[in-house]
């Protein structure tokens, strides 16, 4: 994985060596995501933020089918705390690489990633 890439019509942007960010992923995308070298998916989207988003359980179960780990560190607006940043940072530290972070647009995920880089 050397640069940004597409899975179906979803742009997955490179943040750092083994870290990528995107908008909301869908269940059928996970197989192709796994084939691109992603080993960990981290959701930063709260459950039920949108009626059409898959649940964390659905995403976790689908990810397991392709040997991809799924974690969730949800937040919105002012609910981002130092504890969540530290939890997020620990998840990435324990990862074997190939990390995909997502939320509704990718913006929140980029923010928490940046803060974790600066603070940890």
Language model features with spans:
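Short cysteine clusters
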Residues: 103
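Cys-dependent protein tyrosine phosphatase-like superfamily
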Residues: 1-100, 111-120
